Amino acid sequence: MIILYIILAIIAIVVGYCAGFFMHKRLIEKQTANASNSADVIVENARKQAETERREKLLEAKDESHRYRAKVEKELKERRAELQKQEDRLLQREDSLDRKDNSFEKRENSLERKEQKLALDQKHIDEQQQKASSLVEERQQELERVSNLTQEDAKNLIISETEAKLEKERALIIKEGLEDAEAEADQTARKLIAEAIQRSAADMASETTITVVSLPNDDMKGRIIGREGRNIRNFQNVTGVDLIIDDTPEAVVLSSFDPIRREIARIALDKLIQDGRIHPARIEEMVEKAKKEMDDNIRKTGEQAVFDLGIHSMNPELIKLIGQLKYRTSYGQNVLNHSIEVANLAGVLAAELGEDVTVAKRAGLLHDIGKAVQHETDTSHAQLGVELAKKYKESATVINAIAAHHDGVEAQHVISVLVAAANSISAARPGARSDTLQSYIHRLEKLEQISNNFDGVKKSYAIQAGREVRVIVKPNKINDLKAVMLTHNIRKAIEKELEYAGKVKVTVVREVRAVDYAK
């Protein structure tokens, strides 16, 4: 019985072991199958991700390739454009060199013709000398035969006659050569001047003394005048310009002989009209802004003139003075346009004669620089120009050209002569200058200068076409009683020093302002 239990137990153990073994085997197979499936999924996912990343990298590479290609194409395009510009410049330079070569070739041909003519003349002289020698021998023999002269006396007589004949022939040859040279020189000079004028021709317009300012409507006139005329009086006092308001629809007129002052007034009035707020404080503010804007315009004008002429390394103060020449006139001719024209003419003449073109243009541009400050003093513009050129370290050639362009001093360089010639050509063109406006402006400048010479005067303005001078005085130096005396003194000085028709009204303005701020 016990044995049976043992056997059953053993059988049960064996059966259990077998069952466990088979169960464990199936579990392992199942786990293996699951792991295999999971691995396949992971591999598939990895493959898909790798494919996605490969496509993304490919797209990025294509984008980078497109960007690089576009960049390269842009650089190539810019390079081609730059090369085209360089090629154009080279072509222009080549054309210039060709023209110079042609000019040199013409001169060389002219020299060859002269040399050939001289050779023929020399040959002719040699032949004449040979004939003279033969004649001397014949004369000597003849004289020895028919006269009682000694050989030495006969020799002296023949030599004297021969020398006289040769001297006459030589004088004729020299005279013909001089006439040919003078004719050719005159023709060459005319050609040079004509070419210079043709290559630098410029229109010239006479300068006026008024500026018309358009208004949006006629109601603006009343706002400009202000209550009891305070706005227009303040505007005229601050700017020194006559503001004329008449029946002209939607327009007012600014009148002043000083173009800079008139332009500042125009800019300020335009700003006031656009802003709409017109009162004394606003007027003064806009005038100050207009002065700053005018300074910028003057500087830019000077820089543009220097740039257009290809001039470099010029002092900024000189450039500013060049810009001021735009607002100065000489006998109705705009001084800046005249100076640019002289610079171009001098440059063309210098190029034809083989001189330094840049220095010639520089001297031509600066020859009237003294006129930018001449209204402040009685010194001649040539002397003022020399002082300015020395002050701003210009070369000796430029300084001499400025000093000599009106024959004030002796020209020490060829460029000085060229600048003087170019100045004469520019000034002598028909219609370039008008004396009437210049004399009128000179009279107004003299009127202001007389007033400014008195102690305590801050600034004076000639207005009403010279029929009135308005004098602004320093209130801390001139009281009310002194203002009355100053009026009489200025009147006497004007009567003594100035010639004029009619009457000149002298108005002395003394203004005291007290300003404080409430905090």
Swiss-Prot record:
Residues 209-294 form the KH domain. GO terms for molecular function: RNA binding; RNA endonuclease activity. Its EC number is 3.1.-.-. The keyword Nuclease applies. Residues 335-428 form the HD domain. It is found in: Cell membrane. The chain crosses the membrane at residues 2-22. InterPro entries: HD/PDEase_dom, HD_domain, HDIG_dom, KH_dom, KH_dom_type_1, KH_dom_type_1_sf, Ribonuclease_Y, RNase_Y_N. Residues 84-113 are annotated as: Disordered. One of its GO terms (biological process) is mRNA catabolic process. Pfam families: HD (PF01966), KH_1 (PF00013), RNase_Y_N (PF12072). Its main location: membrane. It is an enzyme of class 3 (hydrolase). It is a single-pass membrane protein. It comes from the Bacteria. One of its GO terms (cellular component) is plasma membrane. PANTHER family: RIBONUCLEASE Y. Endoribonuclease that initiates mRNA decay. HAMAP family: RNase_Y. This is Ribonuclease Y 1. It comes from Pediococcus pentosaceus (strain ATCC 25745 / CCUG 21536 / LMG 10740 / 183-1w).
